[in-house]
Amino acid sequence: MAEATKKPADPRTVQLKRVRLSFADSLKDKKPTVKDGVPKHSCNFILESDSPTYEENREKVKKALIAAGEQFNGQPELYKRIMEDDPKRLCYRKGERFKNTEGEVYKGYAGNWAISASGPGGNKNPRRPKLFDRSRKEVPESEILDVCYSGSYADVILSFYGTDTGGLSIFASIEAIRSLQEGERTGGGVYVDASDFDEVDDADDAFEGTSAAGLGVSSAADEDEI
């Protein structure tokens, strides 16, 4: 009997190790990422430059971005074009580009890189990603903010995808988060509303592919080289 053919993994979907959660409150209750936008479950993920997983995570992101561009419009270097023309429409950016309405870089972002992402389903059917605790047990809704809190380190599965809704973009969908339940809480006492988020997170298109199971940029701004 012939062996069953195993479906190859989607190269746009990657697992990142020990990244830090930020703006994690909407993992429990949906919130709009832009003014008057569709409420979604969203979160940012900080890749800390002093982490032992930093370089490996960067390489995974690079490969996923290349695959997303290639599958969207046949351009594996699409992310470079977006980075140069409109960096806010690329979900993976230098930490210094994540600022509040006063133009101040968010605490914990400087010197690092970060990914902004929302749960699967896009605007039409926004859903919460799968959430697990340190022991890989599913997190009850009532405990989400105690387990998947801003500042916690986590292993995450993200899917990157290209879209031209609202402008040429590459976004990321959160498939699953496993909180390691380590790390000091961040964001306490800081007021945050929808205006603090970039419009890039509110696309109509969503990744439709395999679910959870050092990026090189030629940019006019040297500080954006990943």
Predicted segments with their positions:
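OB-fold ssDNA-binding interfaces and closely related basic DNA-contact patches used
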Residues: M1-P120
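Acidic, gly/ser/pro-rich intrinsically disordered tails
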Residues: M1-T13, E184-I226
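Extracellular structured ligand-interaction cores
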Residues: K40-S42, A110-N112, G151-D155, S169-I174
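Short intrinsically disordered coil segments
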Residues: E59-A64, F132-R136, G188-V200
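Exposed beta-sheet edge/beta-hairpin loop segments within beta-rich domains
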Residues: F132-Y153, Y161-F171
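OB-fold/S1-family single-stranded nucleic acid-binding modules
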Residues: D164-R185
